[in-house]
Structures are given as C-alpha cells and as structure tokens.
Design a protein with these regions (language model features):
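Nucleic-acid endo/exonuclease domains
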Residues: 1-148
Length: 148
C-alpha cells in the first residue's frame, strides 16, 4: 500500500486499525520545501516506546534522518479549540499529546521543531524551517505561544 501524495510505502502495525488523514496544506507546503532542498524525510515517524491512550503510536509529521530532526506542523487546532476538529476534551487531549512528544524528544536529546500555522507565510526555504524559535526547549513549548 502507498501514500496518495508522496508514494511512500505505508507500514501497517498490528495494533493500529486506521490510517492518518491526508496532509494538511501546511504539511504539504513543508514537503515541497524539503523536496526543493533535496532533503530526505520520513512522514509519520513513530517510535515503539512513544504512544498515547489505548497504546496508539504517536506520530511526528516529519523526520529528517540525515539531520536527526523531527518537524511538527501545528495547525490552529493546536492552539485553540476548533469545533470542526474536536470538542474541548479532544482539544485538551491533543495538547497533552503535543507535550508528550516534546518530553520524549527532550529526554532523548532529539531535536524537534514545531512550526506554528501563523508562521507558515514567513517560511520560504528549508533553512527557514529551522529557526531557533521553533526548536522545542520545554515540554510546554506551545503553551506560551499565542496566535496573532
């Protein structure tokens, strides 16, 4: 089985009975920047010891193996409750998943860059994705960011 947009093989896991939704516009834009820079990347990177409720693996949007960097594109639903995505309980659960990914990377000295949706229009190339302000340095990285 292959991904629709990238043609990458999909690895199915025994304990996962769903596939991720298609990429958001922000994720698609990041893919275009990575490809333009000829940067190798993996989509939906998982680790066997990183999972959420009901043992569902938590996924990173992108992993760049040559740079050992993870990138997450955080849409508006990461910063405020949006009824088309979820209710308040679901929003809080998503925030907790973000914190868990942050903590996971910090504990293992893995680099994680979080790109907030309102910054996307200022990003024009691969190097722009790696701005210091996007590098996660705290479990609560997103908690103090507010959309303009």
């Amino acid at each position: 089985m292959r991904r629709l947009l990238s043609g990458e093989p999909i690895k199915l896991r025994a304990n996962v009975n769903f596939l991720r939704l298609p990429m958001s516009k922000g994720e698609d834009y990041i893919v275009s920047l990575l490809r333009a820079a000829h940067v190798k990347f993996e989509r939906e990177k998982t680790y066997p010891d990183l999972h959420g409720k009901r043992n569902v693996p938590l996924r990173f949007d992108f992993y760049l193996p040559d740079y050992q960097i993870h990138i997450e594109y955080d849409g508006i639903q990461h910063y405020q409750q949006i009824s088309q995505f979820t209710n308040h309980k679901g929003y809080l659960a998503a925030r907790e998943r973000d914190r868990k990914k942050n903590s996971y990377c910090l504990a293992r000295n893995l680099k994680l860059y979080r790109i907030p949706y309102w910054e996307l229009s200022t990003i024009h190339n691969f190097n722009d994705l790696l701005r210091p302000q996007y590098l996660v340095k705290s479990k609560f990285h997103n908690d103090y960011l507010t959309p303009p």
